[in-house]
């Protein structure tokens, strides 16, 4: 048997991406410019949304959405306890109060009954998280916010465009996923995407913010607000300022610096051309995994249901009957066998930052249960079928051996 060294999630970069980046480097325009604008245009077409704002991360996108909505001190924003810190840290960045809700017994989604109970007169935003690219139940989410509409008091111009709690999707994992045929981006009120190096679609670092069509929103005005917040509060971006005779500008608010560059956008343009094929390969790998684990103690999350077609960003599994210690030992044994694996994620209340804010893991038992025996396997387009089969065989064998030895 060959010696394997299977990485967890390397980027899939071809000569197409390299050529696009080289073209940008030769053009003399490497910061925010024509290629960033073209990527925004094409992403809007792909997600079926009015406008897209490309930024330097999904975290920046999520924070700017909250700032555009003027969420701040005295407001509450609800997030699931099972997510990465970025879903929650942005709430503290704007001065609002994070409210965590436990997940359901059989999935990563928020417990919608608990969500309903957590809503108060202070609740301004709910942030559902599309973990692994699997879209949450938006029918239920919108039912909850409609039911609680009477508790909501709009405190800003854009909040008045909704006159209810705003749903802001953390779709860091979900570019290309659909819910009832609708693409991620056009489902929630606002959506943030990640284009980090480990994502299905990458610009090395990067992300975007978008929103679904709403007759109460002037899309050009909304886009302009994001642009201003992303570039120091400046009324002109670099491309506009560089036009002959167009140096004049103003700073209308002491804002931030989180714009995307044309070098990053160049990667994205080439990736978007290849994205349908990349998604198909991920589907083939997930299908192969699913067949291989059928009838074993390895239980993966479902990436395809009656309502959801996932972009299959992560292959999240649970090892039936494994304790935390056994799970960790399985990960070590996989590493010895040349297989990189991961855990998604530590629940927020386990992290020092959120313990210091007063959150207690004991209040979120389902999130802990999800974490306790979870292992994420390699899922990327450079995997061969032979490597997938090796991962299946090794994972099942190692799991059985470790659980048998502890009995």
Task: Give the ranges of each region predicted by the language model.
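Structural detector of well-ordered beta-strand residues that form the stable sheet scaffold
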Residues: 53, 78, 99, 166-168, ...
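PLP-dependent aminotransferase-like
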Residues: 67-171, 178
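PLP-dependent aminotransferase class I/II
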Residues: 37-41, 49-50, 125-129, 134, ...
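Conserved active-site segment immediately N-terminal to the catalytic lysine
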Residues: 155-202, 224, 247-251, 299
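N-terminal "arm"/small-domain region of PLP-dependent enzymes with the aminotransferase-like
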Residues: 1-29, 34, 250-252, 378
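Hydrophobic/aromatic ligand-binding patch that stacks against planar heteroaromatic rings
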Residues: 89-91, 183, 263
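Active-site PLP attachment segment
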Residues: 173, 186-236, 262
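Phosphate-binding glycine-rich loop
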Residues: 29-76, 90-92, 100, 149-153
């Amino acid at each position: 048997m060959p010696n394997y060294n299977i990485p967890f999630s390397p980027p899939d970069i071809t000569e197409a991406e390299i050529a696009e980046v080289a073209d940008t480097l030769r053009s003399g325009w490497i910061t925010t410019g024509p290629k960033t604008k073209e990527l925004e245009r094409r992403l809007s077409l792909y997600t079926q949304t009015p406008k897209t704002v490309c930024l330097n991360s999904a975290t920046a996108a999520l924070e700017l959405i909250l700032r555009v909505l003027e969420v701040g001190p005295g407001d509450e924003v609800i997030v699931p306890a099972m997510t990465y810190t970025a879903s929650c840290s942005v709430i503290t960045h704007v001065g609002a109060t994070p409210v965590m809700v436990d997940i359901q017994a059989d999935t990563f989604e928020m417990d919608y009954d608990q969500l309903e109970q957590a809503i108060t007169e202070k609740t301004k935003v709910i942030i559902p998280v599309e973990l692994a690219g699997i879209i949450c139940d938006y029918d239920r989410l919108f039912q909850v916010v409609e039911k609680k509409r009477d508790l909501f008091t709009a405190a800003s111009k854009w909040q008045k465009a909704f006159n209810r709690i705003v749903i802001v999707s953390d779709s860091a994992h979900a570019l290309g996923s659909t819910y009832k045929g609708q693409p991620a981006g056009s489902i929630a009120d606002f959506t943030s995407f990640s284009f980090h190096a480990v994502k299905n679609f990458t610009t090395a670092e990067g992300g975007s913010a978008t929103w679904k069509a709403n007759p109460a929103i002037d899309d050009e005005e909304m886009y302009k607000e994001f642009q201003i917040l992303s570039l120091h509060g400046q009324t002109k971006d670099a491309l506009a300022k560089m036009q002959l005779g167009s140096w004049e500008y103003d700073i209308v608010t002491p804002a931030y610096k989180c714009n995307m560059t044309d070098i990053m956008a160049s990667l994205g343009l080439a990736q978007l051309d290849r994205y349908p094929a990349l998604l198909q390969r991920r589907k083939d790998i997930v299908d192969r995994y699913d067949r291989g684990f059928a009838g074993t103690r390895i239980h993966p999350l479902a990436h395809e249901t009656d309502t959801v077609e996932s972009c299959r960003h992560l292959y999240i599994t649970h090892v039936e009957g494994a304790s935390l210690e056994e799970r960790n030992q399985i990960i070590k044994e996989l590493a010895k066998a040349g297989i990189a694996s991961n855990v998604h994620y530590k629940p927020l209340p386990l992290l020092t930052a959120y313990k210091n804010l007063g959150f207690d893991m004991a209040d979120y038992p389902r999130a802990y249960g999800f974490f306790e025996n979870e292992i994420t396997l390699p899922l990327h387009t450079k995997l061969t079928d032979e490597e997938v089969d090796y991962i299946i065989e090794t994972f099942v064998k190692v799991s059985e051996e470790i659980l048998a030895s502890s009995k």
